[in-house]
Amino acid sequence: MIQILELIKLLGLGIASAILFITIAMSDITKTKDFIKVIDEVKSEYPEGSLESKIPTSFIATIAAVETGNFNFKGADTANKANNFFGIHATGDQEFLPTSGGAKLRAFEDNKGSIRAFINLVKSDERYKDTIEAIDKGPQEMFKGMSVYAENPDYTSILDNVYRNRIQPIFQTENFLLPKRKPITEQMD
């Protein structure tokens, strides 16, 4: 009888652990999906066919996920307060918040401002020429041009890993689970 009670207790702990794990994982996925929606909103502000609208949403989401620690801003309170999802530093008279290390982290009114600034940086800064030239080859090729973005020599590998393991599966399952429906008038064609 004691063994059965012990098994029931362990089963209960296992189920509780599984529920907790799934809840945490779903929370991270929800943050990512919410940010992806905002990226798409910002990209829709640009003319169709423009360079800004061609930058893959998954590319932008991957950079933001890496720079924010999967949108949790753990240990990056200043970046969180500044709505800075890309670690962009202020120049000239741009609004900023000082970090504990003395850097001037650019401050944005909202996450859309941060996304616009990142798109503009990648589009206009000569250092990201290789990234822009790879735009038609997809995010993983674009990452190769981002080695100048961070001091970490493994930055492009980190981007590729986060893309393959976190961002790409969201896009794949979203398209799989929620197929686009044709209007009723076109369904019988």
Task: Give, region by region, the residue ranges found by the protein language model.
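Membrane-penetrating hydrophobic segments
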Residues: 2-13
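Catalytic cores of secreted/periplasmic lytic hydrolases that degrade extracellular macromolecules
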Residues: 15, 21-189
